[in-house]
Amino acid sequence: MPFTLGQRWISDTESELGLGTVVALDARMVTLLFPAIGENRLYSRNDSPITRVMFNPGDTITSHEGWQLHVDKVNEENGLLSYTGTRLDTQEANVTLREVLLDSKLVFSKPQDRLFAGQIDRMDRFALRYRARKFQSEQYRMPWSGLRGQRTSLIPHQLHIAHDVGRRHAPRVLLADEVGLGKTIEAGMILHQQLLSGAAERVLIVVPETLQHQWLVEMLRRFNLRFSLFDDERYAEAQHDAYNPFETEQLVICSLDFVRRSKQRLEHLCDAEWDLMVVDEAHHLVWSEEAPSREYQAIEQLAERVPGILLLTATPEQLGMESHFARLRLLDPNRFHDFEQFVEEQQNYRPVADAVALLLAGNKLSDSELNTLGDLIGEQDIEPLLQAANSDREDAQAARQELISMLMDRHGTSRVLFRNTRNGVKGFPKRELHTIRLPLPTQYQTAIKVSGIMGARKTAEERARDMLYPEQIYQEFEGDTGTWWNFDPRVEWLMGYLTSHRSQKVLVICAKAATALQLEQVLREREGIRAAVFHEGMSIIERDRAAAWFAEEDTGAQVLLCSEIGSEGRNFQFASNLVMFDLPFNPDLLEQRIGRLDRIGQAHDIQIHVPYLEKTAQSVLVRWYHEGLDAFEHTCPTGRTVYDSVHDELINYLAAPESIDGFDDLIKSCRQQHDALKAQLEQGRDRLLEIHSNGGEKAQALAESIEEQDDDTSLIAFSMNLFDIVGINQDDRGENLIVLTPSDHMLVPDFPGLPEDGCTITFERDVALSREDAQFITWEHPLIRNGLDLILSGDTGSSTISLLKNKALPVGTLLLELIYVVEAQAPKQLQLNRFLPATPVRMLLDKNGNNLAAQVEFESFNRQLSAVNRHTGSKLVNAVQQDVHAILQQGEAQIAKAAQGLIDAARNEADEKLTAELSRLEALKAVNPNIRDDELAAIESNRQQVMDALAQAGWRLDALRLIVVTHQ
């Protein structure tokens, strides 16, 4: 095409330069000025990587003054174009805009504009864009969206609770599972779902001070949620950045003590507009009607302002009725306002529980039992169901399940309280105790005597704590020259045990970090035993590396030496041998130690080894834990209660372990108290609530569906394709591990979620569970979600040209592959993606407007095509521009009809589901006061907004590919 001064051109290779203007010409060269950046570029007149910018009728263009023109007509005179049409800001008709006056910052965003402007993408990017659209749309439609991305085992009861609660509007619930059943994971799964769907954006987690780091690590490692820890120092720093320091972060963890200590801080927290608050160890919030504690009042203030609340607490039976009521009162003070009334109500639910027990037993029901069931579900005609349930027909079991479901909906606290017990959940291992009695070395005997004389003024509790760790007493006297490990028989025993069990992984826990470090040195130097260390002085990354080394099967560490605090929140269930080098001071810590291995999903019975020194506090405590509480071989929900009741007596025995007269009687009375409490707890179990919390067959089916999704290889293929195109290096390390590192030629300089020094990833859930240094890649992982956003939010792959070598078709035959997107714009919290995610509609049109997409599948067709370089592609486009316009018009006529069909289907689905949920809850509210008015109002409002948003849904062209047939 001949050049003329004033013409507008665009660079094929540097589209960010904007529109260029021809400002100089000679026989061989042309100079373009790019006003957007104020630079000139010199190009050859022949075969340069630049494309003439020509708009068409129907386009909207912008002048250099900023006003826009809808083009009706294009005129060419002396090689220069002028556009005539309607000015959009004044609606003035027949306005003419010369091309030299076009806005130089013009960006071509529509796929067809990019194609005509010569901005042609690589073919593989077009394919990636379509796959990204397709996969993203499919994932949003999955019923378990938000439940697959966490690094956890697929445990049915956890998935059931998260699925139920995570989909509610501003859920306010109490999670009261027994220890080891994963309350933290349930809370994390609910958070993950709510954040992913947009139902929540700001989250506050309030925990005891000792658990802050555990939660921080757990949220990051398991759910890829980056929380910020607020303490005094961080709070003071943030005050420089904002009036309310808590508004500087979306996801915050802080301690209960931090919340309680300052009135101003509590006010700032209350004003920070959180969507969801999690309170861990909520049973420590002390309440009575006359005198609620300051901690309780602080959380109560927050609970009045925060819409969604998750309280994590011990089981109701452990707490006692009044304490349990206090937790429920935080969730819904209008519903739970009178303790006496609450007690009476709970007693009234006994017939409901008895009725469920009858149905579960499967025996024939008597007339009186049938009448009881009829009375309990009185507002509905259930006669046919009762008859079916009491018959020998095939549908008898289904009828019983339906009746149980109806009873549970009507049960007092089943919507606000979830509680699972080990008895009701399968999959726990046995625990076997091996005690190893060892002689007390003379060096320790001497140190203990001297310590007794010098520490005469110490309290009994201080002496008891000292006596538990004789190596510390010895070291204090000997200083740096003390080498307790040379004579301590526990060290000899440990070395012997490890060398005779070299093929087994062993977790060793001791109270102090110094002990763990000294043991590592001894094991390494004396026996060459590979030992990793894990303590509170290490950073999270260092702990991850130690845990990963321990997890490696062949070349990894045989033993992991943990301090008490350092092991909080970490689970090592791939190991089943636990050595307690010393014993913790209270039963809760003992259970926490065993809980590192005793998790649901543990494949082997747990072997607990306790080497202890005779005539020391250790020998007293090992007997009290085992004989008095049965705390080694079974979980001990009574431990804290019994410990508190005999605290002073027990401390005296620990402080003076050589005087144990009467200790047998103490053990006997503790065991009696333990057995009585345990029987009481068992009797108080609410089996109806357990059935509801457990989820039954539905929960099992949910776990199986997600497991099936885990086995789908399409994610791996898509991810590798994405990483290739983005420019991320991939190094296969074997064992289903891949190392990703940034390259020098990335699509963007910093890929969100990819650290500068790279990261290790795996697509296997089992590998991710044993290798905490490896990120678990699912469709919900930030790397994939950020990758999808990167591709789909920009114009990557939105216009391309390919050649189709096919001798059955005439040379020069044109096909246009169009990817339309049908979507609705609405706030994220409406969760429109449940009904109408951005849905791609593919068309493959020939010159006559025939759509061949149904006959020609995308992937197989894509493999038959070959790429065209950008310069040749621009020439091809210019040659067939009018034909492409004609095909596009035919595509628009066809997509309008197809889009309306999708929109109507989405509206019908939304109306059906949301109306059914609202009707169900309104009907139940008549018999179950735990259904909140604000929840019903929110569902009604949400339904109306969803229907309105779907009515406004539309379509747009997202990508196109021009295909030209060749025989070469």
Curated annotation (Swiss-Prot):
The keyword Transcription regulation applies. One of its GO terms (biological process) is regulation of DNA-templated transcription. PANTHER family: DNA ANNEALING HELICASE AND ENDONUCLEASE ZRANB3 FAMILY MEMBER, SWI_SNF-RELATED MATRIX-ASSOCIATED ACTIN-DEPENDENT REGULATOR OF CHROMATIN SUBFAMILY A-LIKE PROTEIN 1. GO terms for molecular function: ATP binding; DNA binding; helicase activity; hydrolase activity, acting on acid anhydrides. SUPFAM superfamilies: P-loop containing nucleoside triphosphate hydrolases. This is RNA polymerase-associated protein RapA. Keywords: Activator, ATP-binding, DNA-binding, Helicase, Hydrolase, Nucleotide-binding, Transcription, Transcription regulation. Residues 164-334 form the Helicase ATP-binding domain. It comes from the Bacteria. Its EC number is 3.6.4.-. Residues 490-644 form the Helicase C-terminal domain.
